[in-house]
Amino acid sequence: MSTFAPQLAVKATYMRGGTSKGTFFNLEDLPTSCQVAGSSRDNFLLRVVGSPDPYGKQIDGLGNGSSSTSKVVILSKSEVPNHDVNYLFGQVAIDKAMIDWSGNCGNLTAAVGSFAIANGLVDAANIPDNGICKVRIWQQNIGKTIVAHVPITNRQVQETGDFELDGVTFAEIGRAHVWTPVTQWYL
């Protein structure tokens, strides 16, 4: 009789930023072996997204067979002075076992501030009751500072509105929380 390892549940958030979608993780929620760069982290993230997939569909993961949706983001509280959050971006290849950690995704950068606030990575004292919260992001891949301006209503990220973006059907920021591998979804 074969024995199998138990399924691993890891908190993740599937978000849209601009015209891209990706799976977001708080670094602390990843398995310990995946909290540092290396094959354990990459193999785990490849599995979450569903790569490599010789059919190019990523049916067995959260990717969607498109470079616009085959992306991962890892965020953590920043220890870089004058920054709230560290942002690490990975572009996941669809048909091969590779993650490119060398660049940034401007589209998903638009979702980093919202995720950081909603997941307690921004000091609560810096979040206004209403208005705009400036989230100071250290983009680890390229070593640059990015400042996100996130609308806040009643101390929560404002995820609805009427802004329209070419190539995106709906105005609001889409966010779904998942426990990966895909075992539970909640909105």
Predicted regions span which residues?
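Positively charged, low-complexity/disordered segments
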Residues: W179-L187
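A glycine-rich beta-to-alpha transition motif near the start of alpha/beta enzyme domains, typified by
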Residues: M1-R175
